[in-house]
Amino acid sequence: MERASLIQKAKLAEQAERYEDMAAFMKSAVEKGEELSCEERNLLSVAYKNVVGGQRAAWRVLSSIEQKSNEESSEEKGPEVQEYREKVETELRGVCDTVLGLLDTHLIKEAGDAESRVFYLKMKGDYYRYLAEVATGDDKKRIIDSARSAYQEAMDISKKEMPPTNPIRLGLALNFSVFHYEIANSPEEAISLAKTTFDEAMADLHTLSEDSYKDSTLIMQLLRDNLTLWTADNAGEEGGEAPEEPQS
């Protein structure tokens, strides 16, 4: 199928909310070997984020049920819940491995500018983070190290090449701070990164273009929400789950 046709079908699949189809079309487009435009890389991101988002949500629900059934020593629920949770986990790993393969084989190598490179390295960090959510033991440690390395490389480039209000730089810092808090168990680092990012963006807000204003201020609000949540958690109050960067 022609590349232009694949992109068009991905857009149709998005409108029809058929995200697995959308992901398959975008995977085929990436494998054609051409650099993606800004619009095309967003299509790729939206497709896979929706596919993996459903799997992550299902895995959390099933893990919670499994934990409760283990605590209650319920033989009726136990094996079936574990079996189903493992099935979802296998599917989730498969999607993450597919995305990471596309990033390493095509997208990061073909990135022609700093913004694209940061976008894809952030994506690499995100999909290793999703793998870390379901990993255990030595495997988990290796995956966490891979996520941290991708996020850090993206941060280093973004600080040199992009203004503090750039929505891709802000989204990267948001997700890296969530990684520190929820995966790496480093709340101080999470709070420090979120606060520094928010403060630097606030100081630079007057330079924002109209095009970026909505995206940037939305991510800044999420950074502030997380700071409120995490500082309450650190003070011993009950918190909740931290929001990540939304899909545009």
UniProtKB/Swiss-Prot annotation:
Pfam families (alphabetical): 14-3-3
| Highest taxon, organism lineage | Eukaryota
Where is this gene product found?
Cytoplasm; Nucleus; Secreted
* Positions bearing the site annotation: Interaction with phosphoserine on interacting protein: R56, R129
Record family assignment? Belongs to the 14-3-3 family.
> Which additional comment does the entry carry?
14-3-3 proteins have been shown to be PKC activators, but this effect could be non-specific and only due to the acidic nature of the protein.
Name listed for the protein in its UniProt record: 14-3-3 protein sigma
